[in-house]
Every structure is written in structure tokens, then in C-alpha cells.
Amino acid sequence: MASPSGKGSWTPEAPGFGPRALARDLVDSVDDAEGLYVAVERCPLCNTTRRRLTCAKCVQSGDFVYFDGRDRERFIDKKERLSQLKNKQEEFQKEVLKAMEGKRLTDQLRWKIMSCKMRIEQLKQTICKGNEEMKKNSEGLLKNKEKNQKLYSRAQRHQEKKEKIQRHNRKLGDLVEKKTIDLKSHYERLARLRRSHILELTSIIFPIDEVKTSGRDPADVSSETDSAMTSSMVSKLAEARRTTYLSGRWVCDDHNGDTSISITGPWISLPNNGDYSAYYNWVEEKKTTQGPDMEHNNPAYTISAALGYATQLVNIVSHILDINLPKKLCNSEFCGENLSKQKLTRAVRKLNANILYLCSSQHVNLDQLQPLHTLRNLMHLVSPRSEHLGRSGPFEVRADLEESMEFVDPGVAGESDASGDERVSDEETDLGTDWENLPSPRFCDIPSQPVEVSQSQSTQVSPPIASSSAGGMISSAAASVTSWFKAYTGHR
């Protein structure tokens, strides 16, 4: 602090050199150098090589000043002032810290306020968007409510309609059930009426009976006339005579040849086995023999008359039962003179097909039917023992029975008329086998055409042979049937 030249320089205290340490060094150096003058001795204050001006005690107590007079304040005073300045500095620092703490708190609050404002602004925007969304949702909710209300009211209407339809369906069900019962009763009453009419028809006008024949078996006759024929051959002939083709197979018929079936009387009958060879023989004989035939009991007349009556009966029964026949066959088909074998066979096949069709419609036991037994099948059809006679409704013809209906003699089917003047006209063709059987007679209001018996048809029934007794018989029978049928159906 003091120097001899008065040009001491103040240097800041180095680290580790505090006032106490400096005083201790000065005392030690003074004590050690008491009474010595060393050229290299340096002042502990100014660090210059000067003479010692103060004692160690003064240095230790801080009681020394500059000797050049520039500053009269002692070191100890400076030290006290320094401590006071430090205290003031600390106080100022505290005040500044206090002031800055308030500022810091203010800034923090400002930042908090700013952040809160920003958050509030964001929340406002979010709330605004939320309000818009809510408004849209509210509008959608109102629309959905209106739509739901409409759907609810519509559902109510549909429920009412459903209940109304259910009530209507119940009423219709009751009505249908009642109508079904009425229809069933009508069908039963109609079946009874049909049955009574058919039975009345077959009991008064067209009675069909079984007639026993007294003719001997040709096998027995041949065995008596031909002594060379063995017993095995006779048995084979007898077995062949009693065999008939039925439903695609050959079956034994015990009635074959022993009986015949008559219609309208015992004098008009058909062979039970469907053998019309007597008619064929008569036609061949008629071709060679000229002149009128005066024999009243000629088999050809009885066969043609029986087939004509059977045709009339089948057409009338089909009209009563309201059934369309699969084959078109006129009542006068068998009334012509000298029918060829081919034409007669074709007409008989149509008649048998119609009879079997009617038997299928009336649920006749098919085991009793044989395709070639015309009048026997017809007798089973109109028999009083037939349970389903007069029924209405759908039916089905078995395939094997259809095959049996189409069976004919191959020799007859392959023959051709040598005269060439016989052609199949449109009236002789089939009506068609593709017809669909309708389930109810309600849709079959149009009766079959062949049943319309007119006066012109009745005139066609009698053949042009005036001298033939069979022609007169058929003509009178046809006229009586026509008059009875007109009176029966009310067509006057």
C-alpha cells in the first residue's frame, strides 16, 4: 500500500492472499529481517524492493497509509469501508433480487395468463366447432326423429295392414275350408248323380251281361278228329287259347272262350277273348258271294252292333263324367259295311284305349282289366260294385297300361289295304295324347265333341242296306238312344 516513491500500484488480491494471510506474512518477514537491509527485500503490499517503512504490528493492525499523501485513509478504514460496501452490495443485491422476484413472478403470471388466453382461445374454437357439430348432430337427430316417427307410423300402418291381412286370410281360410267342404259335398253329390245316371243308363238302355257259350274247345275237337295229334300238342293249344297279353306280359284267362259279353241284349255280344275272326271271315265270304245275306244271327252283324253300342255308351259315359277321351271315335264307326281288317282293328284299338282311359279316371282295379277285352272292361267300369264311379279329379294312366293300350296284332298292323281307296281322314285321327289332365272339372266346361248326338248322326247309324235286319236293329236302337238322350239332357 505504501511505497518509497509514492508510486505504488494497487493490485487486486490474488487468490489465497486474504488480509489475514497478508498480515501474517508481513509479521513473519519483519521478524525474520529485524535490523537487516536486504536489497532484494520486497514490500509485502506493493511487492516492490523498498525499504521497510512500517513495522509488523502496524501492518498487522492495518494502521498504515500512503506516504506520498495521495490518500490519508488507513488500510483498516479502507477495509471497514470495503466491508460496508460489500454489505450494501449484498443489501442491494437482495433488494434487486426482491425486485426481480416480483418481476419474475409478474412475468410468470403474464406467461401463465398468455398461455391461459391461448388455451381459452383454443377452447373457444373447440367449443365453436363442437357447437357446430352439435348443431349438425341436432339437425341430424331431428331428421332421424322425424324419419323414425314416419317409420314408426308406417310400421303401425303396416302392422294394421298385417293384422287386417291376417284377419282376411283367416276369413279366407274359413271360407276356403267351407268352400272345400261344400265342393267336396258337391263332388259327392255329383258323383252320386253321375253314378245313378250311368247305372240307369246301363240298366235300361245298355245292359251289359256275361253270357255262357256252349261251344266246345277247339283243342277237344281237334283231338277227336286228328288221332295223330299228341296230348302235349292239345294241352299247348288249350293253354295258348287261354292266354292273353296284359300290361306287357302274357297272362292266363280262364274266361277266354267259355263266355261272351252281351250289350243291350243276349243276342248282341262280343267274344270275351277279343277274337273277331268271324267278322273277318264274313267279310271275305261277302266279297266272293253276291246277294243279300238273310241270316239274322250272323256273327259279323252282332260284332259290329256290339261295338257300335259300346262306342255310344263310352261317349255318353265320357260326357256324363266330363272327361275328354284320348281317341276320337264316331258312333257310326262300326256301322259301315264290309270294314277291312285293318280299319276294324284300328277302330277297336281306339275303343279299347278310350275304355281303359275311363277306367283309369274312375280308379278301376287295374288287375281286372285286359286291353283286348272290350265289353268286359266296360262292364267293370259301369259295374255297381265300382266304388269310385262318378268321381272327379286328377288321375294318372300307368305306363304299362299305356303300352298295353298300344298293343295290336303285328300282322294286322303291317297289312296295307290293297284297294287303295281307304285313307285315314281327319275325323279318324287321334285327338292327341299330349293333353294334360286338368285337376278339376271346373276348368273342363266344354264337353267332348263325339257325344253330341244329332239327327244327322242318327241317320248315319243305320247302314244303307235296307234288306239287312242288323242294319234295322242298329238304326232303331240308335234312334231310341238319341231320343232318350235328348230327353235326358233337356236338349229338345
Curated annotation (Swiss-Prot):
Disordered: annotated span: 410-439, 451-471
Cellular compartments annotated: Cytoplasm; Endoplasmic reticulum membrane; Preautophagosomal structure membrane; Cytoplasmic vesicle, Autophagosome membrane
Presence of the UniProt keyword Calcium in the record: no
Inducing or repressing factors: Expression is controlled by forkhead box O FoxO1 transcription factor and circadian rhythms.
GO biological process, one term: endosome to lysosome transport
Tissues where the protein occurs: Widely expressed.
Residues recorded with modification Phosphoserine: S29, S416
Modifications made to the protein after synthesis: Ubiquitinated via 'Lys-6', 'Lys-11' and 'Lys-63'-linked polyubiquitin chains on multiple lysines by MARCHF7, leading to ATG14 aggregation and loss of interaction with STX17.
tRNA processing recorded as keyword: no
Record remark: domains: The coiled-coil domain is required for BECN1- and PIK3C3-binding and for autophagy. The final 80 residues in the C-terminus define a minimum required region for autophagosome binding called BATS.
Name of the molecule in the record: Beclin 1-associated autophagy-related key regulator
